[in-house]
């Protein structure tokens, strides 16, 4: 089990608090001027394909010394061992946390309740391989004998965000199949998707562990009704629907052949489930071999995370730097900024991964914490973000640490597009770190022909303070393997922070109350009668909704 250690009571936390008093005056210009080897000292390579540069952070050797001491005092190493060994570290739900077993490519036994889960994991992978080979190869036929052309994945949360993010990121590896993702219970999402597909050549994947998720099953029934308008015979459902679920009874009642039901387990959290059968849409989009490459990449990062000393451990370093800003500098958010259009959903994916995991105000003993936990995660691809929100990052009053991610090799080397993209990638972190002084601004204005009065008037608005921290993550190329590396790296960063903050990162009770109340409100919307069973605001909104509909 995970230890219950209040981080604020550790010697390291107290040392960091004292260190912060002097560290507030850290200046990145000075830090780089004082140490010509700073980049070499504060960067790390993962294999031959990924470079993580964390030198443009407001840290020095003393900062890192105290942060690593914090990791040791909160017994991070034993927590890592507990997760990988199958202990039930998701204590509020009594579950192990073993998404890492799904990508365990060594087949080393992984025990849960005395049973090795690897034979079951590998059996599902083999079933996925057989299924994807048949669909991609055209052997799987629809009810009129035509091959499948379109896949519609119906899920929500982890059953949607992960597969969608990955299939978009790996679009250069796509085969002939067209992928569609439906998640929102708003009827617009399913209706607009169904307009694009042909019932004779469409395969629906219904991704719901329990086969009871409201949004997913509402969309699934709408899809089935639409399909049967053309197919007619209920028996044809089996040729056009597959299930990613564990509820065989409900799957069968829906009309899906349980031979086309792909299992996963309660030790797989939704936001970590793309490695499981939930990733079937990924395998269909890019082929099973590329899906395995994705697993291999994640497994490589798992091995690094488990076996590397904390001081050289990339997810640990990133997590600790995040804690430094979150808990000592008072930063409330972090931006993830991929300079790769294919990765346009990467920030959204880890918005869920981080905020659902570490958005907790109660510690592992059930007490309200007295310190900050999970940050707000957001971001968009570069260079779009530069023309949207970078203004605030550069010259606003909020401290926003940023991760910049970019591939050295583009999948689309059109003209000089990639050089221009990368020039912006390099320029932004340099500008954020070192800024532009008032002296430089005035010199530029004078050279531009401005008189003294004009210079004095405009100069303050053109000054960049700098000292805005960033990590730069340079990848040789975005491939299934390197994408697997990156996803696992961020997963483990989130885990490390949760361990140190003494919270449970693998439950998500915060999503339950809204669902519970929605289930109570739903029958109240069935007719035009006035509602007075809630607070005045909710009553007023419901009654106004009914009036608008009348």
From Swiss-Prot:
InterPro entries associated with the record: G6P_Isomerase (IPR001672), G6P_Isomerase_C (IPR023096), Phosphoglucose_isomerase_CS (IPR018189), SIS_dom_sf (IPR046348), SIS_PGI_1 (IPR035476), SIS_PGI_2 (IPR035482)
GO biological process, one term: glycolytic process
Pfam families to which the protein is assigned, alphabetical: PGI
Transmembrane segments annotated in the record for this chain: none
A GO molecular-function annotation: glucose-6-phosphate isomerase activity
E.C. numbers: 5.3.1.9
Keyword Aminoacyl-tRNA synthetase: no
Record keyword Isomerase present: yes
Cellular compartments per GO CC: cytosol
Enzyme class name: isomerase
CDD domains listed in its UniProt record: SIS_PGI_1, SIS_PGI_2
Catalytic residues (UniProt): 356, 387, 515
Compartment(s): Cytoplasm
Reaction equations catalysed: alpha-D-glucose 6-phosphate = beta-D-fructose 6-phosphate
Keyword line: Cytoplasm, Gluconeogenesis, Glycolysis, Isomerase
Protein family per UniProt: Belongs to the GPI family.
Function: Catalyzes the reversible isomerization of glucose-6-phosphate to fructose-6-phosphate.
UniProt-listed NCBIfam families: PRK00179.1 (NF001211)
Protein known as: Glucose-6-phosphate isomerase
UniProt source species: Vibrio parahaemolyticus serotype O3:K6 (strain RIMD 2210633)
The encoding gene: pgi
